[in-house]
Curated annotation (Swiss-Prot):
Residues reported in the UniProt entry to bind Zn(2+): 112, 116, 122
Cofactor: Zn(2+)
Protein name, per record: Endoribonuclease YbeY
Broadest EC class assigned to this enzyme: hydrolase
Transmembrane segments: none
InterPro entries: MetalPrtase_cat_dom_sf_prd (IPR023091), YbeY (IPR002036), YbeY_CS (IPR020549)
Stated role: Single strand-specific metallo-endoribonuclease involved in late-stage 70S ribosome quality control and in maturation of the 3' terminus of the 16S rRNA.
SUPFAM superfamilies noted in UniProt: Metalloproteases ('zincins'), catalytic domain
Superkingdom of the source species: Bacteria
Pfam families the UniProt entry points to: YbeY
EC number of the protein: 3.1.-.-
C-alpha cells in the first residue's frame, strides 16, 4: 500500500521521532480495510490546538486532536484522507495525571484522529463505544508490533 504521509512536528513539548509514523498510519488504514493516497498529520502546541478548536468548534479549550476529513470527489482517482492535528502536550498532561505513557497516549490520539477521518464518530454514546472498541483494537495491534510514536 502506497500512502503519502505528510507529517510536521510543530511543537517542542514531547520529543519524538517521526520514524514510526508511516508504519502506524498504514497499519490502521489497512486494518480498517480503507484505501487512500495521502494523509496530512501535524503535531502542534497547545496554543495552536486551542486556536483551531475555537475557530472550528467555538471552544477555546485544549483538546487531544482535531481531524478534518477531505471532501470525497467521486470522479478523482486520488483520495486524500484528510488532516489531523495532534497536541502532544494534552497527552503529556493526561498521561501524568493517569500514570500512563505520554508516547502511547500521543499514539492513541493519532489513531483517534485517523478513525475520525475514516468515518467513526464519538458524539452519541453508541458511536462512542464503537470508536473506543476500534481504538483498543488498534492500540493492542500496534503494541504487539511495538509501533508507537517515540
Amino acid at each position: 500500500m502506497i500512502v503519502i504521509i505528510n507529517a510536521s512536528n510543530e511543537q517542542h513539548d514531547l520529543k519524538f521521532s517521526l520514524a514510526n509514523l508511516d508504519a502506524i498510519v498504514k497499519e490502521v488504514i489497512q486494518k480498517e480495510q480503507q484505501t487512500c493516497d495521502e494523509v496530512n498529520i501535524y503535531f502542534v502546541d497547545t496554543a495552536t490546538i486551542c486556536k483551531l478548536h475555537l475557530d472550528y468548534f467555538n471552544d477555546d479549550t485544549p483538546t487531544d486532536c482535531i481531524s478534518f476529513p477531505m471532501d470525497k470527489d467521486e470522479n478523482s482517482p486520488y483520495k486524500i484522507l484528510g488532516e489531523i492535528f495532534v497536541c502532544p502536550q494534552t497527552a503529556i498532561e493526561y498521561a501524568l495525571s493517569h500514570e500512563l505513557d505520554p508516547y502511547e497516549e500521543t499514539t492513541l490520539y493519532l489513531v483517534h484522529g485517523l478513525l475520525h477521518l475514516m468515518g467513526y464518530d464519538d458524539l452519541e454514546e453508541n458511536d462512542f463505544l464503537i470508536m473506543k472498541e476500534a481504538e483498543i483494537r488498534h492500540m493492542t495491534h500496534l503494541k504487539k508490533l511495538e509501533l508507537y510514536i517515540k
